[in-house]
């Protein structure tokens, strides 16, 4: 039993030593938004034109190719660009 514990710890330490961190400047860091259970990269939009262009592209109109980028742009459009 002790052998397996030692083996597990050794494997964990080995895997942690192989992880390389890449530096991220503040501009890139602020472009990432925390969403849901983890971090997803979501573009931030400064105006409705860019968000609408992304939301209304053909890949976002197809249920099979709709992805997180489509969701982020369409959520921005709904929240900020559509007036009643």
UniProtKB/Swiss-Prot annotation:
Among the GO molecular function terms of this UniProt record, one is:
toxin activity
Q: What is known of its domains?
A: The cysteine framework is IX (C-C-C-C-C-C).
Q: Name one GO cellular component term.
A: extracellular region
Proregion residues are: 22-39
Query: What protein is this chain from?
Result: Turripeptide IX-03
Q: Where does the record say this protein resides? A: Secreted
Q: Does the keyword Signal apply?
A: yes
Q: Which UniProt keywords apply?
A: Disulfide bond, Neurotoxin, Secreted, Signal, Toxin
Organism ancestry: Eukaryota, Metazoa, Spiralia, Lophotrochozoa, Mollusca
Signal peptide bounds: 1-21
Q: Which domain of life is it from?
A: Eukaryota
Residue ranges crossing the lipid bilayer per the database entry: none
The tissues in which it is expressed are: Expressed by the venom duct.
């Amino acid at each position: 039993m002790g052998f397996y514990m030692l083996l597990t710890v050794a494997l964990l330490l080995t895997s942690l030593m192989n992880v390389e961190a890449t530096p991220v400047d503040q501009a890139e860091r602020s472009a990432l938004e925390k969403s849901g259970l983890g971090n997803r990269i979501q573009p931030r939009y400064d105006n409705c034109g860019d968000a609408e262009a992304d939301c209304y592209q053909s890949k976002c109109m197809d249920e099979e190719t709709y992805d997180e980028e489509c969701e982020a742009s369409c959520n921005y459009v709904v929240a900020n660009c559509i007036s009643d």
